[in-house]
From Swiss-Prot:
It holds the Pfam family Bac_transf. The gene is cpsE. This is Galactosyl transferase CpsE. Belongs to the bacterial sugar transferase family. The chain crosses the membrane at residues 5-22, 27-46, 59-78, 88-107, 258-280. GO terms for biological process: polysaccharide biosynthetic process. It is an enzyme of class 2 (transferase). Its EC number is 2.7.8.-. Galactosyl transferase is essential for the assembly of the group B streptococci (GBS) type III capsular polysaccharide. May be involved in the formation of either or both galactosidic bonds by catalyzing the addition of galactose to an oligosaccharide precursor or to a lipid intermediate. Type III capsular polysaccharide consists of a linear backbone with short side chains ending in residues of N-acetylneuraminic acid or sialic acid. NCBIfam families: EPS_sugtrans (TIGR03025). GO terms for cellular component: plasma membrane.
Amino acid sequence: MIQTVVVYFSASLTLTLITPNFKSNKDLLFVLLIHYIVFYLSDFYRDFWSRGYLEEFKMVLKYSFYYIFISSSLFFIFKNSFTTTRLSFFTFIAMNSILLYLLNSFLKYYRKYSYAKFSRDTKVVLITNKDSLSKMTFRNKYDHNYIAVCILDSSEKDCYDLKHNSLRIINKDALTSELTCLTVDQAFINIPIELFGKYQIQDIINDIEAMGVIVNVNVEALSFDNIGEKRIQTFEGYSVITYSMKFYKYSHLIAKRFLDITGAIIGLLICGIVAIFLVPQIRKDGGPAIFSQNRVGRNGRIFRFYKFRSMRVDAEQIKKDLLVHNQMTGLMFKLDDDPRITKIGKFIRKTSIDELPQFYNVLKGDMSLVGTRPPTVDEYEKYNSTQKRRLSFKPGITGLWQISGRNNITDFDEIVKLDVQYINEWSIWSDIKIILLTLKVVLLGTGAK
């Protein structure tokens, strides 16, 4: 998808600058059509992430030769149908080849850099036994951030050295409940096969996997049926079987971040324009224009969340008295005709303008354009392991709940079901679809109060 943008840019620039009196979009459509044909004929995505820089150069050359051959053939057949000159065509081929090579090289570099950063930021819980632990070295070249360890055949007294290294010790009988409260991205299970039955490892994997936490099992361990997907990869130098409810295409994850950054920049520009007129109206009661609050993001990370203030300054204190009138069933608060909402607040909520400052959260990387809604800290602290699954993805400004008539949903479990459906079925195309449907909902003024 990103390569298509490069092709379109190269074609637009060369055709506009070099071709005399160029006005036809037909040539641009022709260029893109050939790109898609050549893209698949040349098997452009095969071994994309494992190709070195020399192999990438060869692949771009192969793509370009295919492009020249097919284009020349079609130009010959339909020679009177296009305004493109030979000079503009070969200039396009040269520019397109250079930009494609640079783009693909950058994507690989970014992936390598982001994976290294991701590894350092990844919070891992180790589940092991004493013998396996003695053969491991913590905080080595792999840089994963171990935050806790559960030693299945040891008591807490045996773990003094680990405590000294700031590792939290988890009792095996409270493993699931403690992981529900911790910020955890992955679990690494490293014990011999013969101990699997004794410590009910399959049940442990299923419980952790159900939270949306990735589970890595040393590949020497027994492979068995799990509730999600699994694949063999490396972790800390071991070959492991990795269990997850779903594995996502890395190209789609990059596209999602690219979409987030682009959308956030546009959104912040709109936010700045709106703020010029809106801020004085909000501040008429003497309070701040921006409401900020700690919210819970991916896998339990706490971040500062921003909105245009639509409620009284003392709204959080009054909320305690209004909890008895909560219209939601479960761990979320909603009240029609909420007395805390200000006069201007009713308007900005109805039009969803209050959400605009969250584009800053998206740009920072705390949130995404599309995802699940971030809960408050007090709501999160009451989650069970199944409900925590909705936090296995970055929270978003919009999502399935927002386009599914959110004012008609009063059961929190129904919201969790929609969030899990989004996570299970996610692709970049589903995000684009939700964004388009959100624009429709906002323009029609439905779904928000």
